[in-house]
């Protein structure tokens, strides 16, 4: 079973929140105290919440559910893409376009445009165009790939979203709420947990913490998809560190 330990979280700096003056009072139940003007997150609260969230991710994955990773801030972007690719899931890591979930019909048309351009770039169509036309289409394709590349094969709405940074990705959370899609989110001390079904109180800025969340989520998903050996290796590696 994919799980994290208190030591894993301490080593990754999950407990470091934001400066106290930026706090969101809704996070009070998850805060241990403050040190040098920075809120410290109570990992005794985070630990069971995180492991419960991982168990639910495993359950969703075991039913062939689609999980969309969302993390567009610079610290999370590359790691979010890597986690989605490794777990054969989906991602948005550049910019959340308004309506990405709630206006799926329009998004689907943009995805079709992206796939058409990809096909044209492979079948020789671009070679028959003028230099300017080919350049314009190449730019269009790159722009669409940046925004939609992580969801172009999703074929419908996701069954859950896993968000790095509830405050930063509030539009994605609101859209998921409107559609009844379960939200798993890392919620720092400056953010609101409202609208998050599975709150994971933790540092959403540190690279090591972000990597821990994503590695654990990947292990949980792989376990649900019947790849238990990989999930077991994750637990063993984390315990050894």
Curated annotation (Swiss-Prot):
GO MF assignments: structural constituent of ribosome
GO cellular component labels: cytosolic small ribosomal subunit
Domain of life: Bacteria
Cystine bridges: none
Keywords: Ribonucleoprotein, Ribosomal protein
Entry keyword annotation includes Ribosomal protein: yes
BP terms from Gene Ontology: translation
Name of a matching Pfam family: Ribosomal_S2
InterPro entries tied to this protein: Ribosomal_uS2 (IPR001865), Ribosomal_uS2_bac/mit/plastid (IPR005706), Ribosomal_uS2_CS (IPR018130), Ribosomal_uS2_flav_dom_sf (IPR023591)
Family: Belongs to the universal ribosomal protein uS2 family.
Protein name per the record: Small ribosomal subunit protein uS2
